[in-house]
Amino acid sequence: MRKKLFLTSAAVLWAVTAMNSVHAATDVQKVIDETYVQPEYVLGSSLSEDQKNQTLKKLGYNASTDTKELKTMTPDVYSKIMNVANDSSLQLYSSAKIQKLGDKSPLEVKIETPENITKVTQDMYRNAAVTLGVEHAKITVAAPIPVTGESALAGIYYSLEANGAKVPQANKDLAQEELKALSDINAENKDKTGYDANKLNVALADIKSGLAKAKESKGNLTEEDVRKIVEDTLKNYKLDQVITGNQINIII
């Protein structure tokens, strides 16, 4: 049975708030600011040499200036990062580049090969990054053939943790729950009049913000509190007549 997505989110927000004061030195954004002097590249292990070069070109790799060692997303690493069974036959093609931005720059996400990333959208990557604690960075994704894009997402987690970021398992689990929920809702509403996947992604970002503010002012939130924030936000984006009651329950 799937977790209540934003009831879980509310709990995570509380845990992260408490954790920040204890683990400030390993804060995700601080790690990005201090260690990503050069961009970091995480490549899928299934890429052939030609595909690797093609993907690096799409990601903007410059061998003369990008001297940091390239990382590889293997099935073993993927299983540990995504908390799934290790499957050596897993095909991993989508790849990611993470680079730091100034502290006044917003989080940027760009899929350089949108025709080849079939499941994870730009906004899904953005939502996952926000859930992990990324505030100011540029994330670029590419793949040489049609794939879901999930190995690039795992690559972002891998890069952050390999550089010293302490990403709570609860945050990673929540990012995965969000991705699953969004993918299912997008599939169920495909071609439905009035449905806009981009609007839903923006609405979810607003819901997170609303939950954080409500938790700061009220403390623990009830399911009714979360439901009101979710329903009011969906209504604001004119999605309340499109998203079904069951889908709202999944979000909550």
Question: Where are the regions a protein language model picked out?
Answer:
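Sec/Tat-exported extracytoplasmic proteins
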Residues: L59, A63, A129-G133, S159-V167, ...
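N-terminal, leucine/charged-rich tether regions that mediate assembly and partner docking
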Residues: A24-T140, A162-N163
